[in-house]
């Protein structure tokens, strides 16, 4: 995969990766942070919880995300954003579907990427990062890299086969199917159409859309806390 994430994310934001240039020195870190929180679609409770866990829980795992980023060429803040959405950085997180840990890894995925102990945060973070990198490399959907990244995030949440089948319903030539088109299709789809189960009235298709949006929000907040300013005229996802 080389440096595809490094190139892509640098092109979408200012100083998203270690090698990117810092933002305009006339803009303070406080201004960047305030602006990013104001633009976030998260509610106040979610914002406050994120800030609390960023201060009191995340530091324990920062080096693990750095190591996973180096091993996979995926930017650290993106991995940390995925992990926050998955588990709120709780190494013992688990769901009734059997997924566990920081990146909520399944048994099948653990076997694929060599994770022996899913509740081991370092193994889980590196395993989830490897799996995400595999999904991105294998993804054939999307005319742009921005589309491909959003579609890969949806695949991490909903499963790559399900997302591929949705894309095929839109166009047999899936490489021309955009994330916007997939979102429009997912909104109309119930769980049974995806061989999944809806939770009450919350459809699995809508869950995948919300998942991508929330990872985007958390990514931008993590970048802002690192004194990194996304370009307002560009959309990350």
Q: Positions of the model-derived regions?
A:
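N-terminal export signals and maturation junctions of secreted/periplasmic proteins
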Residues: 7-11, 18-66, 91, 225, ...
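Catalytic and substrate-binding regions of cell-wall glycan-acting enzymes that process beta-1,4-linked
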Residues: 35-38, 153-221
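Second-shell loop/turn segments in exported
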Residues: 48-55, 65-68, 91-93, 111-122, ...
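Extracytoplasmic
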Residues: 60, 74-79, 84, 97-100, ...
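Short, functionally critical alpha-helical segments immediately adjacent to catalytic or ligand/cofactor-binding
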Residues: 66, 73-90, 128-129, 152-157, ...
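Surface-exposed patches in mature extracellular/periplasmic domains of secreted proteins
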Residues: 77-80, 119, 140-153, 227-231
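Secretory-pathway/luminal and periplasmic proteins that interact with or process carbohydrate-rich
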Residues: 87-96, 135-138, 158-170
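Substrate-binding/active-site groove segments that recognize
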Residues: 92-116, 124-133, 191, 215
